[in-house]
Regions:
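Helix-loop junctions and terminal segments of transmembrane helices
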Residues: 56-73, 77, 135-136, 244, ...
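Short runs within selected transmembrane alpha-helices of multi-pass transporters and secretion channels
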Residues: 20-24, 47-50, 54-66, 116-135, ...
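Membrane-proximal transmembrane or re-entrant/amphipathic helices at the cytosolic face
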Residues: 399-406, 413, 425-475
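Interhelical loop/hinge segments that connect adjacent transmembrane helices in multipass membrane
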Residues: 1-2, 6, 141, 145, ...
Length: 475
């Protein structure tokens, strides 16, 4: 089951992510009114190289430590040493690739921008390994504090720099300062005396092998569209697409992603009891979609209001069109999150590798075809097709891992689907009634969102869903 302690732990992480995203929204609101889509496109292109290198070279030290029943000082030293080695390797790879990258994309500014942006992921490699003790105890207040303070300092730096005339460097500064600050704060919250050692590396190696391979494929998969578009479309168009993509994934990154850490810890505790694990997985997947589906559908229905309220001006109008469809694509991809945690908890990282490889294949095939035949909207449509395919792949994978039939998995979600359909219909009717009344975008967005949320919660109530039941096992 998902215990109340797990839910409280998830609440801390979700609160941290929501607080951080709220700060990000304020930062973007300021930057988008000062900078141009081309500035965001340039930074997104530089971040693509950083993201690929960061993901490929990622060592899931915290996840590996969480799975251990007994964590000694030697384990922490090994994790810290691996983090340093990873940071050094990342520095070398990024600096070596920065200049060729700028030549390929015909923009000399990318060299310096890539070098500076690399400081962020390098600093995250040095995160205090002692934080694992809090995670194993289901205490996430410390992670909440570190992330939130980092976001506040990052936002203050970015806003100050843009008003001082720093241009696109304000975006880079936000990324770097946030990571540096969060890492430093972890040492205040979870003190650790650094020591170099690889004495326990064998206990990390099996887990890291498959996981690193999966990360390589994942990096190529998630950054493929930006690399492809960066080469064939203008930086302004790339900026519009990137902004829409970042807004579309806000629900899963803010609500779902952070909640999966305590869920994985809970799965790990009951992995030897298959029946309890099945019940817990069904509850986690239902709760994931309970949150993700209405938010993503709501974003799709109000994409024009979101862009007008947050970004302002006609220069971002194409982002609203892309967001309308990318938000829907995110609905199905959210279902992957609990499956990811399940695979790690039961020591099956090879499953993640296979899933990522399947997704990469379809992304390369469909996004390339979509861009070739229908330009940017074709790429957006391809993203939706890939997410639907991966949803059914995830259903089949869960059946193989813990013996849950696809019919049971889909049946576990039907009330969410019906409630969201009712919400979508009534929100469309409301927007039709409000059309032409010349309301302020922020006011209309707030009213529409509140109306949609009330309808959705009411529909769930009518269908017998009670949110308090989340702390009870699934029957």
């Amino acid at each position: 089951m998902l215990s109340m302690k797990t839910i409280l732990g998830a609440s801390w992480l979700v609160s941290a992510r929501l607080g951080g995203r709220a700060i990000d929204v304020v930062t973007v609101l300021v930057l988008a009114r000062t900078l141009t889509p081309a500035d965001f496109g340039l930074t997104a292109l530089a971040m693509t190289l950083i993201a690929v290198a960061d993901t490929v070279l990622e060592i899931p030290l915290m996840q590996a430590l969480i799975r251990m029943k007994f964590v000694e000082k030697s384990h922490l030293d090994t994790a810290f040493t691996l983090g340093i080695l990873r940071g050094l390797l990342l520095s070398f790879v990024v600096l070596a690739a920065a200049w060729p990258f700028s030549i390929i994309f015909h923009d000399s500014r990318l060299t310096a921008l890539v070098a500076v942006l690399a400081i962020g992921p390098i600093s995250r490699s040095l995160y205090s390994p002692s934080m694992v003790k809090f995670i194993q105890q289901m205490s996430f207040r410390q992670a909440f504090t570190a992330e939130l303070i980092g976001k506040i300092l990052a936002s203050a730096t970015a806003i100050s720099l843009v008003y001082l005339g720093g241009g696109y460097w304000a975006i880079a500064a936000s990324s770097v300062v946030g990571s540096l600050a969060a890492t430093l704060i972890t040492y205040l919250l979870a003190p650790y005396r650094p020591a170099l050692s690889l004495s326990k590396v064998s206990e990390f190696s099996t887990f890291l092998g498959w996981f690193s391979s999966a990360q390589l494929v994942s990096a190529l998969s998630w950054q493929f569209d930006r690399v492809l578009l960066g080469y064939f479309v203008t930086k302004s168009d790339l900026g519009q697409y990137t902004m829409a993509t970042d807004l579309a994934v806000l629900p899963t990154q803010s609500l779902i992603g952070p909640a999966m850490t305590p869920v994985m810890a809970a799965f790990s505790r009951i992995k030897d009891d298959r029946e309890r694990l099945r019940n817990a997985y069904l509850k986690a997947s239902r709760f994931t979609m309970l949150l993700a589906v209405p938010v993503c559908v709501g974003m799709s229905l109000t994409s024009d209001l979101i862009v007008n309220a947050l970004l302002g001006g006609s220069k971002w109008k194409e982002a609203a069109i892309y967001l309308q469809w990318l938000a829907l694509a995110t609905v199905f991809s959210a279902y992957y999150s609990p499956l990811y945690s399940l695979a790690l908890a039961i020591d099956r990282p090879s499953v993640i590798f296979r899933l990522n490889a399947i997704e990469l294949f379809f992304r390369i095939l469909l996004i390339s075809l979509g861009l070739y035949f229908y330009s940017l909207m074709g790429a957006v449509a391809a993203r939706g097709a890939v997410s639907i395919i991966m949803f059914f792949v995830a259903l089949a994978t869960a059946r193989k891992l813990i013996g849950i039939s696809m019919a049971v998995e889909v049946g576990n979600l039907w009330k969410v689907g019906v409630s969201c359909s009712v919400m979508a219909l009534l929100v469309l009717l409301l927007r039709h009634e409000l059309a032409g009344r010349d309301l302020n975008a922020i006011i209309e967005l707030g009213f529409t969102a509140a109306f949609g949320a009330a309808v959705y919660i009411g529909a769930l109530f009518v269908l017998g869903v009670r949110l308090k039941a989340i702390s009870k096992p699934v029957e």
